[in-house]
Amino acid sequence: HWEPYKVGEIVTKGPMVMAGYWNNPEETANQLKDGWLYTGDLAYRDEDWHFFIVDRSKDMIISSGFNVFPAEVDNVIFSHPKVFDAMCIGVPDDYRGESLKAFVVLKPGETCEADEIISWCREKLAPYKVPREVEFRDSVPRSPVGKALRRILREEEMAKRAANK
């Protein structure tokens, strides 16, 4: 039973579900439990059982006890007229547990300050979803098919923070 519009993880079982990860029993144990594949995809359904994927569970940020799906924040920033691309990650925050940091790529010839991006987000998002930090970059990491590679940004950010301690 899955209530309409409630976000949860997609879990599936059947003859076409993979048997496991090649030579990776630890990851297989994390994803397969009693024959059920835990996909890591977070989604909701409507009344007609159409599913809408909102993000990956590994990317979800918990800020002040609230779940934040970074793709939602990415899309708001992407809607700014000066922005070409954007990607958010969670970063450690002593008060909130995690807060959002946005990595923003501007359109050619555009200039923008972090405060402008933060104000844009404040107009469109709940306060706990608004990025606390903005970093402008030439690009954000994506796979060859355009998938957000937040893991790379998290690794870069943690290395920067460790070097500054």
Would you name each region that the model predicts?
Residues 1-8, 17-19, 29, 33-34, ...:
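Conserved ATP-binding loop and adjacent catalytic segment of the adenylate-forming AMP-binding
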Residues 134-137:
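General small-molecule cofactor/ligand-binding pocket signal
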